[in-house]
Amino acid sequence: MKIFFITTFVFITSLAVAQPCSYKDLEQTITSLYTKIKPCNLSIAKMDFTPVLLYKETKFLGAIGIHKKRLVVQFTSIKKDNTQPSLYQVEGWTRVTKNTRKFRGTIVINTLKTLVNTEETDFKEEGIAEGNFLFDEYENLPAIGIFKGKVLLCWAISNKGNLEYNDFYEGADPYFNNAFIGTWTSKQTQKTQQVSWAHLRVPCSGDLDIGAGEFIPNKKYLKYGW
């Protein structure tokens, strides 16, 4: 079930251009859609976030570096670890301009929070999951590196008890999901660039996104792959 509406453009823009943008800013953007945030009593070990992480009804929007080059990210495999239940083994690929690189790594979910919604929904419970990621571009090719940072997922428990991707507020201006923010460090030069990607929005991307209700790239970045 989804709810579609547009909040003021000023609200999301002020969050997007605030410097520096932090993981806390992302959390506040999502939780602003809800009445209350509180500790979650569910067990991370008993929850399987694979269907949330592999949700493919929408593609990632991502950017890298000071010029906000378009970053394409695709997960091809995610498996919950049998011995460490908060850890997920990840495989996928990235593309910047014409360079496509395979990666493998991990996502670790370490915190759950429950979100209280006053709207009528089909969910027993809604919340966010927070964690860390580390992805290694492992091929013997130029322009490879290490991605690392933090991840934020919006989830929901259905009335049937299933853990689902939460798109209830899709269409709301501040909404995004499956957000990753952090750095990419070149293996060749050891130089680090800021990186971020998510569904529907590019988190912490400054003036890249000028859209209200949907992502629209700023014209000055079109030459960087947008």
Residue ranges of model-derived segments:
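Residue-level signal for secondary-structure boundary sites
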Residues: 100, 113, 190-192
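Active-site/pore-lining binding-face segments in mid-to-C-terminal subdomains
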Residues: 13, 169-172, 181
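Charged, amphipathic alpha-helical segments
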Residues: 39-44, 67-75, 106-120, 142-169
